[in-house]
Amino acid sequence: MARYLGPKAKLSRREGTDLFLKSARRSIADKAKFDSKPGQHGRTSGARTSDYGLQLREKQKVKRMYGVLEKQFRRYFEAAERLKGNTGANLLGLLECRLDNVVYRMGFGSTRAEARQLVSHKAITVNGQSVNIASYLVKAGDVVAVRDKSKKQARIVEALQLAQQVGMPVWVEVNADKVEGTFKKVPDRDEFGADINESLIVELYSR
């Protein structure tokens, strides 16, 4: 399955929640009515969605939010099952450790897609070494930075300014002057308020 390249607001409307696929400066919440599905006037059918349908929709939502395709998402789930603790929380923790997501959380990219592009264009280092793999898993204590030649890019400067206004997550510590940050720890499930019901995903893969 290829990565979706169509309108971002359409995906958020389909899932009924903001997937944070666009910059906070142009919030999808202001551009899309989440109580209607894609279509000229939205679909008004009140048909009840099956349990399987709800589980599948939740998985699709999380995949789109983090920009992960099915095969890779399944591998994350299998890895989460092998870890101690709650499988659903482990799954989200692994997704939060992805380098593209950490770059986004630190405010170097205004969206995860933009952060992924920075990684693939070799604009990001981890502990002083260039890393261009978006799925690279960042560990607690790792220092993630923008390379010197990229620090003055307008999109990075603007994204960081916006992130400072909105506020950084507690599990990252960012030095805006150096355009670098430390990934302090894998966030606890209750530390990020994403509109995700990960138990539905666990139920889906346990069928």
UniProtKB/Swiss-Prot annotation:
User: Is this entry keyworded rRNA-binding?
Assistant: yes
Q: Which residues form the S4 RNA-binding domain?
A: 97-157
Q: Does the keyword Ribosomal protein apply?
A: yes
User: What GO CC annotations are associated with the protein?
Assistant: small ribosomal subunit
InterPro entries from the UniProt entry: Ribosomal_uS4 (IPR022801), Ribosomal_uS4_bac-type (IPR005709), Ribosomal_uS4_CS (IPR018079), Ribosomal_uS4_N (IPR001912), S4_RNA-bd (IPR002942), S4_RNA-bd_sf (IPR036986)
Q: What are its GO biological-process terms?
A: ribosomal small subunit biogenesis; translation
Supply the alphabetized keyword list: Ribonucleoprotein, Ribosomal protein, RNA-binding, rRNA-binding
Check the UniProt entry and state the signal peptide residues, or none.
Answer: none
Name the segments for region: Disordered: 31-52
Question: What GO molecular function terms would the record report?
Answer: rRNA binding; structural constituent of ribosome
State which residue ranges cross the membrane.
none
Subunit structure comment from the entry: Part of the 30S ribosomal subunit. Contacts protein S5. The interaction surface between S4 and S5 is involved in control of translational fidelity.
Query: What does the protein in this record do?
Result: One of the primary rRNA binding proteins, it binds directly to 16S rRNA where it nucleates assembly of the body of the 30S subunit. With S5 and S12 plays an important role in translational accuracy.
Instruction: Please report which protein family the annotation says this sequence is part of.
Output: Belongs to the universal ribosomal protein uS4 family.
What is the protein name given in its UniProt record?
Answer: Small ribosomal subunit protein uS4
Q: What is the lineage of its organism?
A: Bacteria, Pseudomonadati, Pseudomonadota, Betaproteobacteria, Burkholderiales
Identify the coding gene.
rpsD
